[in-house]
């Protein structure tokens, strides 16, 4: 195949920008983080039933505040530790809806998945999911009896 220099330049200029969204509703506060190529942003909200019901609005408002839309997100990482079943159920429903409607891959992780890792930060989650081969688009619930 022969490419002219202008065609090659066009190919080289096209880059896939990966924007990632981390969601954690298992703690005292709802935590959201956006990881872009250049920046990391995060917010927290009170962990209440009303905020669970408004989670889609909270996510969209957070994205809008950073000049992003849900279509700009390439992957979602969601904590599925068994601490807040209502929060996990609501957030998983929203994430699955994003997956079905926008084809956004999601990864359900638990901090227990990252054995022998210390001082884990939320911005490390995407790389740790890759390292520990967390499967995409699979919900693997953790049950405590």
Each language-model region and where it sits:
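Oxyanion-binding and handling regions
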Residues: 2-4, 8-57, 68-71, 106-145
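Noncatalytic linker/hinge segments flanking ATPase motor cores
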Residues: 62, 84, 115-119
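DPxDG-like acidic metal-binding loop motif
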Residues: 75-80, 85-106
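Generic alpha-helical propensity signal that fires on short helical segments
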Residues: 43, 50, 58-61, 86, ...
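Stable alpha-helical structural segments in soluble proteins, enriched in small hydrophobic residues
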Residues: 62-66, 93-95, 99-101, 120-129
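N-terminal glycine/serine-rich phosphate-binding loop of ATP-dependent small-molecule kinases
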Residues: 62-77
